[in-house]
């Protein structure tokens, strides 16, 4: 099944791309979510008519994404967590924690753009990817430090 992508879809393509997908993926996910439409002759012609306008919009979005990515490139988010005597962290740092910390610093991102397969559960620094567009991403560092408890 051929579809025209209305929005960027990770691992599939960018806005305006005509891609071949399995029929179930197209009918059950891409089209209902508004991410794509069936690539009929009429739809392709309509899409091509608005291509110049969309190209300018895409270029502006790409520049904004690159600017946002450049602002994030040197960021280190530091979290303090309790640890036991062996240095094992109680709890973890997940997408929601990273999202909240970036929001507090004034960065506008979507939680879905944070690529974190598993919560961070170890002391030290971990690299986390933030994707703005399929071709634009930034790497931030997430650092977990132990809570300092003063002896009595």
From Swiss-Prot:
> What are its GO cellular component terms?
ribonucleoprotein complex; ribosome
The question of whether Ribonucleoprotein is a record keyword is answered with yes
In the record, biological process GO terms are: translation
PROSITE patterns linked to this entry = RIBOSOMAL_L9
Q: Which GO terms describe its molecular function?
A: rRNA binding; structural constituent of ribosome
Q: Provide the alphabetized UniProt keywords.
A: Ribonucleoprotein, Ribosomal protein, RNA-binding, rRNA-binding
Please give the PANTHER family that the UniProt record associates with this protein.
Answer: 50S RIBOSOMAL PROTEIN L9 (PTHR21368)
Family, as annotated: Belongs to the bacterial ribosomal protein bL9 family.
Q: What is this protein called?
A: Large ribosomal subunit protein bL9
